[in-house]
Structures are given as C-alpha cells and as structure tokens.
Amino acid sequence: MATVVPSQRGLNKLYPDARTALEGIVRDGMLLAVGGFGLCGIPEALIQALREIGVRNLTAASNNAGVDGWGLGVLLESRQIKKMISSYVGENAEFERQFLTGELEVEFSPQGTLAERMRAGGAGIPGFYTRTGVGTMI
C-alpha cells in the first residue's frame, strides 16, 4: 500500500482543463472568493467551468459583480449566485434586475474591508476592527 505524505497531497497537480480541476471540490451553497480587479485577472475559465458544472445557490465574494456575459455576470445570468458580497456592482444590468426584484441577496463592503475580511478569514481570525465600519452596518 502506498503512503501519501499529507504535506505533499494536492501539490504539483496539472489538469487538462478548468472543469477537471474543479471536479469533486465544488458543491451547491458554497462561498467563492473570486480574485481579479474589475474584469482584469479574473478566473474566467474557472467561472465558465462552474457554469457548466451547474452548482447553485453560490455566495460570491469579489470586488465586483462582472458585467453582462463576462466574469461573474455569467453565473448571475444562469441564476447560480444567490448572494453577492462586493464593493462595486454598477456595470451589470442582470445584477441590478435580480437585486431589484429580490432574487439576489447583496452585501456591500468597502474594498479595503472586503480584502481584509478575506485575509482574516483565511488566517482563521474571526473578526477585526476597522475605522471604516464604525457607525455602519459593517
């Protein structure tokens, strides 16, 4: 029987495509932290693969909601995102429509606060103080 060293599990894996890379690790209802700035540096192949796989009821945390037909806009169009945590959403008509009709839950967070929330969460820090949020719902 082969022994797998835990510190090496999952390292140096190459996948033929984004969909194969996501198999077995995505599920309905999960939270996705999506990188990039505006439409630059977004994981477009992974977003397309999520659409193809068909996971639903996702919470997406990103500095923006994409635009119609691009970025997270693709997952909004297919109704796969149920909640959006973002600092800017102004260029996506589908986002606006879903928000105004109550189909989409939205949480706005200043960009720096959003980045710190992601950093703190990744480090296991349950909360942090920021002067930006004093006196607000944040």
Question: Model-found features: residue ranges?
Answer:
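Conserved alpha/beta enzyme-core scaffold
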Residues: 1-138
